[in-house]
C-alpha cells in the first residue's frame, strides 16, 4: 500500500460532518462506541456532533446538537449507560418530526448519521434516509432551506451500530451491551448459589431479553442451571412432570441447590406465558422445596461495561466512521456487525427483516424456524445446553471407550468449566472418563482417577485449576506415561492448557515413533491468560484476565484523575505475547502499550513522553501506559518509569504498578465459561469419532497427523488443526504464533490516544449479505 493511500484516511473526512446518537434502551459499551466515532471522525478531519437524548434531540435541535471535541469524550470509556442520553421518541415516528430533524441536520451541514441502538432505532434511521430527498424538497418549498443547502446535503449516509443487552438482532454474533449484561447476571447467580447451597433452596431467576432467549440460554450454560425457559423453544406439553423429575433427580445425586432460569418472554407451546412465579408455585406444590424467585430487572442494564463490550464498541465505532465516509448515494444503509472476531458490514434492512422474521415465526408457532433464524451461534448454545442439562448420564455400555482429561501449564480461569463439559459429554456418550492431576506429571506418577457426573458438579464458575496444572513436559517420562496409559486403558486424551499443552502435544506426536502406547488420539483446548497458543484466535482464560486488568486500570485512572498530572506505568502478563497489553490498552483507554511484537526504540519512548507532556496542557491531566512483561529485556518497567519520571519533571509525576498473578485468578467471566463449555463439548464429539476411526484389530492405533489436533477459533469457526501443521506457524523461542490477528487493532489504539499515524484502510470490512454470512457464521 502506498503512502498516499495510507495518508488518505487522514483527509477522508475533510469538509464532512458526522452526527452520533444513542437511541432506545441503553446498553453498556455505548460510550465506547460514541468515543470511537468522535475521535476517529476528528482524526479523519471531519466535524463530529453529539445528538443528546436520541431522536428527540434530533427533532428538537438547538442545544441538543453540539459539536464534540477530543477531550469531551475523555473518561467515558468505563461508564455504563450512555453519556449523551437516550429517549424513546414519538415525534420521530411522525413525518412532521422527521422534517424538523432533517432541517436541523441540513442547517449544520451534517450528512452522515451514526445511530447506536436496537432494531427499532435502526429501522427509524432507514426510513429517515429513504425519505431524505422528499424531506429536503418540502423544506425548500417551505423556504426553510436554500437551494444551495439542499444541494450540499443532497444525500444522507446512515450506519447503524447495534446497542442492546438482549442480543436480539440478526446478523451479528454479539450486540454492544450483551456481554456486560451477562456479567451482571453471572455475578448475581454466583452470589445466589452460595445462599442456595447453605439452605438447600431452589431459585427461579428471571432475566431480561424481551422476545429473545439469548441471555437466559447463555446464563444457564455458564452457571450449569437445571432448566431454562426461552421463547424460541417452548418446552413440551408435559414439561411440568419433566421439570419436577429433573429437580428431584439432581437432589438425589447430592446437589444442595436447583437453579431455574426464566427468560422474561418465555411461553409454552400454546403461546401462554411461563412466569417465574408460576414456576415457583409448581415446584412448591409438587415437590415442597424451599423456593425463591429473583427478578433481576434493570440491574442487567447497569454497571461498568466489560472489556469485551469496550473493545467491541471501539472497533464498531471505527468501522462505522469508515463506512460513513466511504459511502456514496448508492450504498445502502448498513449495520456494522461482529462475525466471530471480525467486523463485517451488512445491509441494515436485510438484518431488520430477518429480525422481524424471527418474531413472526414465533407468533406463528414455527419455533424450529425461529431457532434457525437466530443463527448458528444461538443453535450451538442450545445444542450444548440440551446435551449437558437434559440427559441422565447412561451407565457405561459395552464397547465404550476411556478418555482422560488433564490441565497443563499455568492456571487460567475457565479450565474447570472445560473439564466439566469434557467429563459430562464423555459420560453422556456412554464412555469412561478419567481425570489426571498435575499436568503431565499425573500420567507419569499414576495420579489418575475416574470421574463421575457429580465429580465436576458446580465447577463452571470456579477459577484456577481444580485438577492441578503443571508446566512439566512429557518427554522425560514417556516410559512411565506409556505404562500408565496401558494400565488405565486410556484410549484418548484431552489436554486443556497453554503453550505447554501445545508443545506437550508435539512431543507426544514425536514419541509415537518409540512408544506404540502414545498412538492414541489427543486434542488440545487452548487455555491460558496469554492467548499465545498457535491455531486459535482466542484462549480460555484470556477474557477473565483482560477484565481483571481493565478493572485495575479503571481504579488507577481514577486515582490519577484525582491527583492530576500523573502518569501510571502498568506491567501486564502474557510472556512475549502482547495480546493482554494491547487489548487492555484499547479497553482502558491507554496512551501507549509496549509489546514485543512491535519493536520500539528510545526515540519511540521519547515521542510518548512528549505526547504526554502535550496532553497535560489539555483538560485531561493524566496518563496510562501499559507494558507487556517481556516486551524488551533492556527497556524494563523500571527503566521506562525512571525515564518518564526524569523527562516529565515539573510537568507530571509517574507511578508504576506490576499487576502480577492476580491476572491468573478470579471467577471466570461469562465469555470464558461459555467458550470453555463449548470447546469441551466440541472436543469430545471429535474424540468419539476419532477413536472409532482409529480402532483396528481390537485396539486403538492412531498415528496419522490429524489424530493430534489443536481445537481453535479461527475468524468465524471452530476448527481442528493437526499440531504438526502448526509447527511452522510458531515462534518457539518466544512462545508465540508468527501471525496474530489482534495486531491489526494496534492502529486503533494509537488513533484513540491521539497519535498522528497512518491508518491502513485496506483492512476494513466490505459489505456482505446476511444470508451468505449466516452459512459461514461463527460456531461460538
UniProtKB/Swiss-Prot annotation:
> Regulation of activity: what does the record state?
Allosterically activated by ADP, AMP, or fructose 2,6-bisphosphate, and allosterically inhibited by ATP or citrate.
Please list the residues that bind ATP.
25, 88-89, 118-121
Give the record's pathway: Carbohydrate degradation; glycolysis; D-glyceraldehyde 3-phosphate and glycerone phosphate from D-glucose: step 3/4
Q: How is it modified after translation?
A: GlcNAcylation decreases enzyme activity.
Where primarily located? Answer: cytoplasm
What cellular component GO annotations does this protein have?
A: 6-phosphofructokinase complex; membrane
> Could you give the subunit structure recorded for this chain?
Homo- and heterotetramers. Phosphofructokinase (PFK) enzyme functions as a tetramer composed of different combinations of 3 types of subunits, called PFKM (M), PFKL (L) and PFKP (P). The composition of the PFK tetramer differs according to the tissue type it is present in. The kinetic and regulatory properties of the tetrameric enzyme are dependent on the subunit composition, hence can vary across tissues. Interacts (via C-terminus) with HK1 (via N-terminal spermatogenic cell-specific region).
Stored PANTHER family: ATP-DEPENDENT 6-PHOSPHOFRUCTOKINASE, MUSCLE TYPE (PTHR13697:SF59), PHOSPHOFRUCTOKINASE (PTHR13697)
Record-given protein name: ATP-dependent 6-phosphofructokinase, muscle type
- The source organism is Oryctolagus cuniculus
